[in-house]
Amino acid sequence: MASAVFEGTSLVNMFVRGCWVNGIRRLVVSRRGDEEEFFEIRTEWSDRSVLYLHRSLADLGRLWQRLRDAFPEDRPELVRAPLRQGLIAIKDAHDIETRLNEVEKLLKAIISMPRKYSRSEVVLTFFERSPLDQVLKNDNVHKIQCGFQSPVKISEIMRSNGFCLANTETIVIDHSIPNGKDQHGAVDPAEHLFEGGGELPAELEDGDDPAAYVTNLSYYHLVPFETDILD
């Protein structure tokens, strides 16, 4: 299963000031044609730098697990935190726009947690650029100039040109992901929501390009000034 790979953090004395979910990319992550959905996240840091990240539902689930492992004495408090409920809400969302909004709500809750957690190595590493982010950064992405019929929080709307990760012959695989077989004691049902790749229900209709980019706006929100860009 593809995943963003996190190996420590170089973001010393920095923290995430804000984050927004721009959309979803459905990427081919194996030569067998297996696909996985990645949320594109725009992050603004304390030094005013901006990073675009791509994280899957499984990555979000592992972040929660790593927080619990990093702060074992605070596990009861973390279980009551919005993170667990947010993960379940994302898993249960059957509408794409609702799912994107739930992901954004969850990420904002994470960076709003007490500094002990929000500025911990676990959280900063999650928001650090991964090898997958670097690969996708070089992808040709069309920036669409938009007008809005109703207030929208997203500041930048983008659409992919059908990028396929397998075409680059670069597949990022995290072999260190625990399979859960060695866990003992009481098991939280939420921990198993993200096993097996954290698959989400397919929202694309028949005939749609499976690699198409889905923005955090409905068709009625998006009114491009140059419609030929979308042809």
Curated annotation (Swiss-Prot):
Coiled coil: none annotated. InterPro entries: PX_dom_sf, PXDC1. GO terms for molecular function: phosphatidylinositol binding. It comes from the Eukaryota. Residues 1-134 form the PX domain. This is PX domain-containing protein 1. The lineage of its organism: Eukaryota, Metazoa, Chordata, Craniata, Vertebrata.
